[in-house]
């Protein structure tokens, strides 16, 4: 049977209990990954809003051959909370990939209808270059805001490794450079003496009080309350996140969340979250301590993602970060489903707080 004939046999419907194992196996096959079923359950079943209703499937002969899946979250939009979905894990088995107007289009149409029926105000996503072009051309995706990926080097090891043959020399130069960079990090900036900084592995309900303090610093951002932060950073299987909390007189006044991973010849650090009260010294100290932690763990360079108009950029620039194009996807797109949100407000870059934590890929 050729591909066009296979596409003609497709039916589109919603996820049903019991589909998860086949779905996860399809994901692992298409993306050559080894994701556990437990991670699938964390991602879709345990998300702040049950995301299983937003998994749309393509079936052929009773077999799942494609999906359009979203995770559902609460979005702070001005002075209210609206339901949002973020597109993730969208795929079609290679044997059924034909015209992009085929299975993908049918999945997207059903996903749109499902979002509207379930009271979703807006959907957004962080597509790669190919997905960005296809989404804008065929699926009515619109550019949301301008985001930037910021870069800071913590060691010259990975850069030298591509140019110098002698491993000993590369490792020695990398070690020396990391010491020098760490020294300059340590001597720059002052800490607030009354603020206590603690590395923690969990959140408790007190984080909700912090959320109430900081939520109005931005008009639009994903709700970062106890439910969301615990799900995103503490309950994920194989959790690799490191949480630094700042407290003043027993109350949380800021947090930075970081991670690092090895990729090819480099160890890459990520600033997943950077959020604090309006005190530049607290933000500065959190970033400094986060960078020192990453440096001690032999990270070669660090990436952060911010809205291009976010005031927190100033703190990153003070720590030596600079914009770097091409190092990570920097597109963010949206589809509006409700009159409860306005395009002119959604697309105002100055209103948003965005981080790597908003994307499921990091």
Which residues does each predicted region cover?
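Conserved acetyl-CoA-binding loop-helix of GNAT-fold acetyltransferases
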Residues: 92, 97-113, 280-292
């Amino acid at each position: 049977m050729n591909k066009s004939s296979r596409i003609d046999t497709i039916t589109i419907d919603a996820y049903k209990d019991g589909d998860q194992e086949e779905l996860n196996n399809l994901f692992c096959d298409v993306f050559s990954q080894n994701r556990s079923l437990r991670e699938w359950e964390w991602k879709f079943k345990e998300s702040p809003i049950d995301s299983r209703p937003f998994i749309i499937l393509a079936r052929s002969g009773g077999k799942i051959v494609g999906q359009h899946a979203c995770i559902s979250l609460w979005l702070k939009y001005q002075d209210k909370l609206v339901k949002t979905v973020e597109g993730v894990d969208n795929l079609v088995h290679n044997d059924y990939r034909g015209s992009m107007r085929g299975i993908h289009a049918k999945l997207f149409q059903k996903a749109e209808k499902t979002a509207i029926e379930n009271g979703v105000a807006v959907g957004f996503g962080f597509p790669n270059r190919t997905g960005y072009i296809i989404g804008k051309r065929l699926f009515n995706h619109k550019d949301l805001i301008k985001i930037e990926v910021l870069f800071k080097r913590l060691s010259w090891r990975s850069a030298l490794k591509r140019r110098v043959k002698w491993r000993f020399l590369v490792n020695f130069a990398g070690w020396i450079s990391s010491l020098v960079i760490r020294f300059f990090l340590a001597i720059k900036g002052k800490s607030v003496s009354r603020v206590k900084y603690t590395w923690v592995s969990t959140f408790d309900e007190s984080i909700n009080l912090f959320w109430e303090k900081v939520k109005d610093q931005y008009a639009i951002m994903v709700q970062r309350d106890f439910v969301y932060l615990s799900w995103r950073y503490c309950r994920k299987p194989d959790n690799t996140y490191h949480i630094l909390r700042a407290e003043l007189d027993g109350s949380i006044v800021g947090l930075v969340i970081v991670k690092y991973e090895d990729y090819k010849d480099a160890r890459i650090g990520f600033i997943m979250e950077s959020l604090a009260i309006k005190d530049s010294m607290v933000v500065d100290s959190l970033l400094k301590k986060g960078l020192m932690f990453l440096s001690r763990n032999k990270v070669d360079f660090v990436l952060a993602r911010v809205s291009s108009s976010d005031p927190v950029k100033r703190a990153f620039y003070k720590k030596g970060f600079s914009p770097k194009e091409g190092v990570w996807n920097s597109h963010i797109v949206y589809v509006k489903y409700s009159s409860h949100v306005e395009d002119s407000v959604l697309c105002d870059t100055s209103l948003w707080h965005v981080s790597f934590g908003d994307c499921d890929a990091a």
